[in-house]
């Protein structure tokens, strides 16, 4: 986990992408934000980049590769798994089945994507502060 690395945000809604960008700007975190509209674009980037991202934030319902499929592909890829990148879902679809499936794929968090920008900002602030304090095996490489 590279705490100064980019935050990968996979979100097919351009409106939600702008909301995430605005929130990170208001919170004054210096991490680069890399937006992808679907899981296949993000997976291609993660498989080819030399940069180690700080965190992956993903929606679930997206075209091509949905969030669950993306998480599964990352989790099964030994090289990507060793990067120790926290994988978090932010989704409006927080039903019991989706939450259970997410945690069966070893995600590090599942958050309801609030339609209230202040609520979403509060959640993102807490998430960022938590992960900035965490120690991961990759900290020792």
Segments predicted by a language model, with ranges:
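Receiver (REC) domain active-site loop signature in two-component systems and cognate sites
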Residues: 62
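C-terminal output helix
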Residues: 115-125
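Conserved acidic segment of CheY-like receiver
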Residues: 4-24, 56
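As written
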Residues: 102-108
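CheY-like receiver
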Residues: 124-141
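Acidic, metal-coordinating helix/loop segments flanking the phosphotransfer/catalytic sites
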Residues: 21, 35-55
